[in-house]
Amino acid sequence: MTPGEVRRLYFIIRTFLSYGLDELIPKMRITLPLRLWRYSLFWMPNRHKDKLLGERLRLALQELGPVWIKFGQMLSTRRDLFPPHIADQLALLQDKVAPFDGKLAKQQIEAAMGGLPVEAWFDDFEIKPLASASIAQVHTARLKSNGKEVVIKVIRPDILPVIKADLKLIYRLARWVPRLLPDGRRLRPTEVVREYEKTLIDELNLLRESANAIQLRRNFEDSPMLYIPEVYPDYCSEGMMVMERIYGIPVSDVAALEKNGTNMKLLAERGVQVFFTQVFRDSFFHADMHPGNIFVSYEHPENPKYIGIDCGIVGSLNKEDKRYLAENFIAFFNRDYRKVAELHVDSGWVPPDTNVEEFEFAIRTVCEPIFEKPLAEISFGHVLLNLFNTARRFNMEVQPQLVLLQKTLLYVEGVGRQLYPQLDLWKTAKPFLESWIKDQVGIPALVRAFKEKAPFWVEKMPELPELVYDSLRQGKYLQHSVDKIARELQSNHVRQGQSRYFLGIGATLVLSGTFLLVSRPEWGLMPGWLMAGGLIAWFVGWRKTR
């Protein structure tokens, strides 16, 4: 370790101990040296004994800085790792830090714009930041070219070395978890950190965020539900992003929304509709929809529209994941736990050899008590959470896209019920889910699939005669080979008459599999199965000749 890493590690240890987080060290024989070492650091007592463990953990992470704050935010969505009282505290972590010097931001902007002064591109540049977070901060200005108000987002200087150093330490801690906790291996701590690292590094590239914002804006162009500010790509780079400045009411300011005459029920329902539209229609969803990133337009309060910013984190689901997710929700609310278990196996979320009966019983045990509440009070996010936590006991692999989805759904629900406590998520979402599933089957779906594949077949059509000729020629050669092998087998004197049958079948299957492997690679595993069956049959025939 470098001297800098040693100093940072000392600061982390001192911070953890000053908040009494040594309580998290399990009392096991393997941890005895660690606990004895802690007792030797008697001059670092717990200075916050009046606070509960969850709050102390949150405060410690806030003190350690941006990397640890964001790590805590991510861990708050993994409630299989922590009990609820700790996970709830982690969810309160705020990504707010002191701004860096505006002059440094100005220098970075000038460097990104080819060394020209800020005044060459922008008017009214405000040296004082409008907002500041752990990764970047925002300044206001006007475009010189058209006079439009914009915000300029700038990455914090020299943050990458800090992030890499802290991530290295977090990886080391993660490698200790399987040794210290009996259930540590199942929790896959290294995968959790790797997932976090990818998310964090992605946030450092503002070109990625620019592309995400442009895509979301295109998806909701002319939509009455959501507005994404315009991005000006000519001014964007990895370390800087320029987009339209928006004016709106923070979605968390319920009093201001009510004062503006906002239709709160419609606003809450539209939040749910926006989320499910992103997931199921677009397969591309804003995955950081906490209240700080959502505003409501001042205009048309009777027909309210959301404004979304900060598109650094997005998620996507493939067609299979979307179908299984929609069917899971519907099966759950129909209390069809057998269907839920089968869907998890069919989707590949749990291993194929999972005992479906045991899995169904586990899901029923965890989920049935949820229905003690009125349907309107049931949380979609917690439904997913319970299902995933149960599935992890059956070796469910970590699904990063589903973790993002569940976190976002919790945000959407929290905002919706803050706006309108009587919000019935199931009533709002059920028609959408049923309509989407219906749209995936039947004649319209077949027509759509044909349209998607039509260009491929049009391209291949001129090659069809040649492909047919090649197939017939290879088929004739195959038949000749099979006949030759069969004649050779018949000439042999075998002790058991059945051996010829097995050897012939084996040869046919092997050659058929070889032929298909060469001429029809798109058939997937079928040639392999034919060849494997042929080898087995051949082996049986050979055994019968002995």
Curated annotation (Swiss-Prot):
The keyword S-adenosyl-L-methionine does not apply. ATP binds at L130, A131, S132, A133, S134, I135, A136, Q137, V138, K153. Its EC number is 2.7.-.-. Keywords: ATP-binding, Cell inner membrane, Cell membrane, Kinase, Membrane, Nucleotide-binding, Transferase, Transmembrane, Transmembrane helix, Ubiquinone biosynthesis. GO terms for molecular function: ATP binding; protein kinase activity. Pathway: Cofactor biosynthesis; ubiquinone biosynthesis [regulation]. Residues 124-502 form the Protein kinase domain. Pfam families: ABC1. The chain crosses the membrane at residues 501-521, 522-542. Belongs to the ABC1 family. UbiB subfamily. This is Probable protein kinase UbiB. It comes from Escherichia coli (strain K12). The gene is ubiB.
